[in-house]
């Protein structure tokens, strides 16, 4: 019986918070603050211990990681758009190196301890929307559901 009352209290609280939460999460400032909080936690608990190793401190390693990220990103995107006609729906497989390259570049920027800005977040949302659009059916046709272009365009309009 005690478990049922706890669940009903949890559901009541959730129903009270949900309408305000939906509105707040659409605010770009809240999104950027949340991202910076997550990046801060990752920096303290994951990145700083790795960063203290000698190999990661070397300049050659840092330059190699940046170059590798750029090469993977450009090669993946180029192959996706060049070979999409021949491969059909399987062309999205070439996005895997592009996504790995993007993650590598984002991780490199975290290593350089630069905070996320609204401009970077808009660019990231636009890239994620395009990636999702290609991954869902192999075509750019605005069929994405998670990262929609409407949300990134509305934040662009609000920022202007």
From Swiss-Prot:
Annotated gene: srp
GO cellular component: outer membrane
Membrane-spanning segments: 63-83, 92-112
Bilayer topology: Multi-pass membrane protein
Stored InterPro entries: CRPA (IPR008436)
Compartments, as annotated in UniProt: Membrane
Species: Chlamydia abortus (strain DSM 27085 / S26/3)
The protein, known as: Sulfur-rich protein
Record's keyword terms, sorted: Membrane, Transmembrane, Transmembrane helix
């Amino acid at each position: 019986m005690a478990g049922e009352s706890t669940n009903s209290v949890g559901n009541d609280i959730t129903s009270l918070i949900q309408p305000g939460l939906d509105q707040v999460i659409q605010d770009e400032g809240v999104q950027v603050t949340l991202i910076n909080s997550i990046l801060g936690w990752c920096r303290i608990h994951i990145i700083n211990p790795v960063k203290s190793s000698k190999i990661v401190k070397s300049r050659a390693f840092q330059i190699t990681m940046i170059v590798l990220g750029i090469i993977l990103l450009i090669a993946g995107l180029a192959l996706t758009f060049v070979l999409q006609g021949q491969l059909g729906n399987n062309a999205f497989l070439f996005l895997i190196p592009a996504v790995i390259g993007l993650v590598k570049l984002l991780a490199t920027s975290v290593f350089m301890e630069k905070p996320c800005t609204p401009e970077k977040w808009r660019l990231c949302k636009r890239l994620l929307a395009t990636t999702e659009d290609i991954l869902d059916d192999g075509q750019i046709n605005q069929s994405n559901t998670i990262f929609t272009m409407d949300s990134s365009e509305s934040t662009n309009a609000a920022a202007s």
